Amino acid sequence: TYWYCWTDKIQENNLELTELFNETVGKEKGIHVTAEYQGTYDECHQKLQAAFVANEMPDVSVMEISSIRRFAENGVIEPLDSYIEASGIDMTDFYDALLLNGQVDGSCYGLPYLRSTPIMYYNNTLLKEAGYDGANLKTWDDLKEMAVAVHEKTGGYGISQYSYIWTLDAFMIEHGSSVLNDDETATNLNSEAGKEVIGFFRDLIDQGVVHAFNNTESDKVTADVQNEDTAIWFSSTGDLTKFSSMADELGFELGVGFIPMEECYGTPTGGCNLVMMSKLPDKKKEAAWEFIRFMTDTEQTVKSSIKTGYLPARKSAGESETMKAYFEEMPMARVALNQLTYAN
């Protein structure tokens, strides 16, 4: 059994790849995988905790990267080192910034699957109405200038954003800090970096330039985008196909870029890895590993990236002829991959 999260293109990708596994590797090795939808990451994690207590766990699950340490330390998920070694997988083929999130105390507990960074999206049609081009939006000063201009000249919002700790972390990283301290025991929000980042957006909110929402209202940002009431927003690279389709349907010019820089460029990474549950009998563990290995190999990584807009987690995938052709067709998809250079 395989537990996955999210609907739309992500759900389609999970179901298609699971079916492909069953028809190929699964058929050859006598393994059949049933994919089961579990809602959001938080909902899935809560169900995993309950299933662990009840000893009714799936065999494989997606796991949002910030939760891997907690589940590993509590013995819920299995270290994968012995399977990796026996399979001879070249772990250097995974981008370092994505691979490290799956490691806890020197052991690997998850392989990168649907991985992402936050990126800047913009409605270039609105920016051009205000006399700017989003391709030139590189710094915090640019961000403020363009956002204010859109608000003053079009009456819309320069930026729409819900309270998204991931985006906040990107801006903190650009100040040489992060939302949490290195031990993840306290926040850095009262540091000079935190005060500067929060103050920057607080001023723009007070001016009516930023349309701000709480952390459960991401749909309201999407509504602003659909209504063409906002010029700039920050979201996952995994949303690229969604916003690209929206722009095509509504007829506005969509652009994407790095998170605007202050002292330097910077970004956290996000998304999910694939993990194996503990407490499984050996035969189930072997089957679970075959599925994880299949889902994260180069060919499936390419398919997942093109289908969903998530990053190609393997170098061999990112450099494949298929991905190169896709990047030619969809240059915006390359932005997040290039931004990995600055990932924390």
At which residue positions do the language-model features occur?
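Conserved N-terminal structural module of periplasmic/extracytoplasmic solute-binding proteins
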Residues: 1-73, 85-92, 261-264, 283-287
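Ligand-binding "clamshell"
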Residues: 71-79, 105-107, 174, 243-261, ...
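Short helix-initiation/N-cap motifs at beta->coil->alpha
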Residues: 37-47, 66, 138-145, 213-227
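A structural signal for short loop-to-beta-strand junctions that line the ligand-binding cleft
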Residues: 50-51, 56-59, 87-126, 157-161, ...
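Glycine-centered hinge/linker elements that transmit conformational signals in sensory
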Residues: 146-149, 185-214, 259
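Long, aromatic- and glycine/proline-rich binding clefts that accommodate carbohydrate-like moieties
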Residues: 254-257, 306-344
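Extracytoplasmic/periplasmic substrate-recognition and gating elements
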Residues: 23, 28-32, 130, 199, ...
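Periplasmic solute-binding protein
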Residues: 66-81, 97-135, 161-184, 268-277, ...
